[in-house]
From Swiss-Prot:
Annotated segments matching region Disordered: 1-40, 53-72
GO cellular component terms attached to this protein's record: chloroplast; mitochondrial matrix
Protein name, as recorded: Monothiol glutaredoxin-S12, chloroplastic
Residue ranges of every copy of the Glutaredoxin domain listed in the record: 185-285
Protein's job: May only reduce GSH-thiol disulfides, but not protein disulfides.
Cross-referenced Pfam families: Glutaredoxin (PF00462)
Organism ancestry: Eukaryota, Viridiplantae, Streptophyta, Embryophyta, Tracheophyta
Alphabetized UniProt keyword annotations: 2Fe-2S, Chloroplast, Iron, Iron-sulfur, Metal-binding, Plastid, Redox-active center, Transit peptide
Biased segments, Low complexity type: 1-21
UniProt binding sites for [2Fe-2S] cluster: C210
GO BP annotations listed: monoatomic cation transport
Gene3D superfamilies xref list: Glutaredoxin
Superkingdom of origin organism: Eukaryota
Length: 285
């Protein structure tokens, strides 16, 4: 899968959250010794310390663009989000730090997102262990300095990493051998008009089957918008959808994204609109 897609932040199991999240144990937390990850016999990815990373201001309004990609890169790394008063609220890791921060500021109250510190991995595709060790190091540094974990990393706090509420992929028919009582084109029309945002993709929302579909899903998720997906490759439940949809939308390729019953376009158009802030404005209408 393409690592450049705007995916959601990596979710770590609750068992990996620091025991110091409980006040009684915060002063005794000890992480296992850090060992540099190796690939081909060479150590990789040296991360900046939390205390040495420079804060980057986060605009309070989601409609305002984030700082440029040099300040907040769309790359793998570790990041810490601070409230406007300068208190660390959450430490996370991501394959796309920029997309993760964008997703946070759209879902988390504005009084929790004032600035962010970032340290980017040396490699384009670092091993997960490398990122996890950086995450542990930042948490350990903060806990050593303050005696407690950031609120968002405390077990039971779902403000930042709550389980995603994803609706299942929609199916247009019960099965390919079931006789339809209405034309397939009418089902498509009803679907795109009854749901604010619909993405017709190759594969499922959780497992897109092409890079373009994966990128579209990542962009929509990073905007925090509610959307439904339809798998155009599902010949059992969406038999004939691809050809019928091409005629309905007068658009020859997939994915296809509809907003408010109108076709927005495919991956290139959606990506361009997202970069210009036009997609966020469209979702607010």
């Amino acid at each position: 899968m393409a690592t450049s897609s705007a995916a959601a932040a990596l979710r770590l199991p609750a068992s990996q959250l620091p025991l110091s999240a409980r006040p009684s144990s915060s002063s005794t937390l000890r992480f296992p010794p850090r060992r540099p990850a190796r690939r081909g016999g060479l150590a990789v990815s040296a991360f900046t310390k939390l205390s040495e990373a420079s804060p980057v201001a986060i605009p309070p309004e989601p409609a305002q663009p984030l700082p440029d990609e040099e300040a907040l890169p769309p790359k793998p790394g570790v990041y810490g989000v601070y409230d406007p008063a300068g208190e660390l609220q959450f430490v996370g890791i991501s394959r796309n730090v920029r997309a993760s921060v964008e997703g946070h500021r759209r879902k988390v109250p504005a009084d929790l997102c004032g600035s962010v510190k970032v340290s980017i991995a040396d490699e384009e595709t670092p091993d997960r262990t490398v990122l996890t060790n950086a995450w542990k190091s930042w948490l350990e540094e903060h806990i050593t300095a303050t005696g407690k974990a950031p609120p968002g990393n405390v077990a039971g706090n779902h403000t930042w990493v709550g389980p995603p509420q994803r609706p299942p992929d929609l199916r247009l028919t019960p099965g390919r051998h079931v006789q339809l009582t209405v034309p397939l084109e009418q089902l498509i029309d009803r679907l795109v008009k009854d749901n604010k945002v619909v993405a017709f993709i190759k594969g499922s929302r959780s497992a897109p089957q092409c890079g373009f579909s994966q990128r579209v899903v990542g962009i929509l998720e990073s905007h925090g918008v509610d959307f439904v997906t339809v798998d155009v490759l599902d010949e059992e439940h969406n038999h004939g959808l691809r050809e019928t949809l091409k005629t309905y939308s007068n658009w020859p390729t997939f994915p296809q994204v509809f907003v408010g019953g109108e076709l927005v376009g495919g991956c290139d158009i959606v990506s361009s609109m997202a970069e210009k802030g036009e997609l966020a404005a469209l979702f607010k209408k």
